[in-house]
């Protein structure tokens, strides 16, 4: 039986004895954590293993949900996050291993992990923030995944009806595409979505990385809860998103490492 907090208040009680956490941030993402976990475990046989790596674990908001459910959890994130007393106390209480890592491009913290360690790797709301060539990172992740392990990817949908692609006003003003100039100049690097993907493009991404990867499940995901996107939709927009999956705001992809024969086959070049 999957363990899930009864509601958000019960979820917050997990953090309270250890110094609490950011309530506003956790409230905003709570339904994403819950729904993603339900999707994963609805198609995962626990007999396959329970070692889970959360890449970009932040304040352990997602990691804790798996730790209380019997998973052996490891989290990787920036040292400044894992130095927080409340994060360290929560990790100790729930036997979550913390791997501080200041350079995800090379994923140096993962080098201490033995080959074929993890059964599930969470890569949720991370891929859109990457600003570097990720091949070296994926080599490390591939190495520590067991044959048969699954990589879980969630990310915004490039074709989302409420996404930046459909900004007609910006198009008519000839202000280009992608990130806006003021966002690039005024916000820190990892605050941005530097690259958003379509579902087909995301599947192609992993097919190119390695023929050992097999995309075994995929979904266009509706808004996790009203207000999650920070952009009003209205009844008509929500109706369109329900009827046309391509226009839904989020993507969910399960990539299985079916075997370890070819490895990561991409070699970056100038």
Residue locations for each model-derived region?
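Conserved class I S-adenosyl-L-methionine
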Residues: 48-58
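Conserved SAM-binding loop of SAM-dependent methyltransferases across substrates and taxa
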Residues: 59-70
